[in-house]
């Protein structure tokens, strides 16, 4: 018989409760809290449980509560237990009080926001006092047990009901249930919840996130009968052939010993309204130990012939209804969605239902830009749909168990989940100080064991995690073995202590590179290809964090996926992370924008390091999300031949055929369609096909830039996407016959007008002016109307990316960061000196030849040579040669920029698009003729940086401007200088015109991590000489 620790021979008064300072003691994880269990609803009707109808015995207490704020628990007046304090006002529950105008949110990554010695926390400990008046039905008071369940309270709380102390709980991220029955009275009842911002538990909650407080998840009342189900463990399993299934059931009853007699437990398994299997058994188990034969428990199994399997691709859920009976009288019914699947590690591979998985994963914090850490079901569904639409199949609950509803949705929509214990001690020195201290084992244990007891019935959870960044120690070792004994159906992972310790079934490093080793002394990170080949190592490798998506990032991402597909034991990973953790704020100047660390006066803080998302805080996608979608897509393509035009397509679906997929293809030349077609795909799981698209590929004379584009779409809507959703795409360049450019008829050379100050070149309505002193093309008029707002100038810098900055900041300079290397090299302060500016009128063109020396002090570090060829048709063909000193670090870019008047026209280009792309992040971009409004050419990263580039462009058309050549470009209403000098995007100011930037070369963005230089050598501008050409016309 399971009995909670609710003995109340002595009920302490208010001051006695506070005097104990339970929140200062890591060994007191709770007082009077009920044992952890799955989500209950206590239906009294089996079919209502089957259909998941609202239960009359489960009631939500969300809504407006009364709230008072105090600087510490000891500053709270005891009269609050019986009446609201004078300063109270209404506040929503759930909420974080920092989002309601009290106290300040704090963002730190590693550093603890409190400066005391564990387990102690500051005496000045912000405290929220919540109160609520409620009533309960007389039947609830008179029969059975009435529980109150808090799904999440940060970080610890005491509970009173009608002025009587009920209990205490720590652990912000797991439900805490208490028995209210002894305290309820007829009519009005008063709940009082005292929440402390800091507790001993805070030392185990040092996650990289905003530190907020309050009742931030739902609160429930639950009425259970006198004899009741108090725990149910459901384990669906498949046989060795993955054909037939069994549902193993263990149910525990809470009742007096006398009442146990005559009770039985039934189980029925449903798919929709069809009952698949059913059974019933009296209490008692064959298990015998020193306690006896477990009279309050029942263990049995149901055989299920050929059940539909659960996977992320095919989330086939059954409804398991567990009932408690006295004879033929139904006392209670509970129900859960379950799935038949078998997760195992065999032959060095993580397998689901016998198939090796490829984890297309992402880390996700519970965060909302308006509500802080309060997420609604609609928010959860929005995230799940976006993940599924972008080819994610897995999510890591970083770094704590999520709200209960999250798992139910993942079961239904189909996402693999790593459920992670709410343990992180990243700021400890050493990091394993607490994880190797036996005095902290009870606190560690409560977080791991209660997570499992609460969530183990969910099929979506395929891996348990012991926590995050807490070093390696005996506490983790002990809990690893507890998990393996108590849930052998799932593997366990833990990265701390080196990612490959004896406390993990999976090598699960964070930010290990594909090839390069990082020989960190304590915990070396080997290149992932090398790691799986180390002597004696047979485990699969799944990166628990990789591809740090901070701002303009995710370079090199396709390299990881090439390795995952090449090496079977490299089974994917979880991108860091899903959404930018910024908060909407009205700033002191009245402006409204997204805030990050330090914007609330929070100290310490880690600035914008909270913004590492694939999506903005409001879930608008970053361009990097498209790159992730493409790399992770479930179809791979190979060009077999060009005439006939044949391709091979491979499906990476493990469990479903292509029953809703169409292959669409098109051949384009210079963005113009030549051929196209579509066909329905009929591939089995893991199937492939070779398809002839054209018997003969015949190209028109002069065809250039010929590409084959393949894409797979879903014509029918699915549970997570609309009709015609694109799931995969790929492009292949096709050979085109060489052709000489069409000869041009010379119209003579433009006129050259010479003065002491300028060269002036005229051709019809075109007039160009070059300043002879500076060498700059300073004016370009068409029909007497000036087009330039600034001269054309060399551009060697970019507004530093987060990856360029790394961890460098004013208080702590990192000389290895790219921005510091460029700064120390003087790149941001170079002085241009024109050392040559010659002009001559030739037979067919007028040539202006200019050379600049870029000086750092007295030293010439860059030489730039421009040859400006002006022709009678109004074209400027610009050939640029340059050279840099070997003492300079690789440059971020080599190009030119200039400002022009806004054209009030869309931007059209022939090149890679449509989204922003960079040299090391362009696998997802397609070569075509694209057109977008000017506003879409900017990516408004919250911390302003270089953005908006489009690579491998052959033609750019915007209003009057027509540019051709081979270049990368951006067109934006913001200067590089303003991007560099502005710290929040909402502070960006409109400028007079629009900046056109044309790059011959541009460095990659990197992204393996954001604190070390992560741009791979092939994407660095290591050359010391360069050449590029572009042609410009303004009509």
UniProtKB/Swiss-Prot annotation:
Cofactor binding notes: Binds 2 magnesium ions per monomer. Binds 1 sodium ion per monomer.
Protein residues bound to Mg(2+) 1: 424, 426, 469
Alphabetized UniProt keyword annotations: Glycosidase, Hydrolase, Magnesium, Metal-binding, Sodium
Pfam (any one): Glyco_hydro_2
Cofactor(s) demanded: Mg(2+); Na(+)
A GO cellular component annotation in the UniProt record: beta-galactosidase complex
Gene Ontology molecular function: any one: magnesium ion binding
UniProt record, GO biological process: lactose catabolic process
Ligand binding (Mg(2+) 2): 605
UniProt-annotated binding residues for Na(+): 208, 609, 612
Site residues, Transition state stabilizer: 365, 399
Protein name: Beta-galactosidase 1
Organism encoding this protein: Klebsiella pneumoniae subsp. pneumoniae (strain ATCC 700721 / MGH 78578)
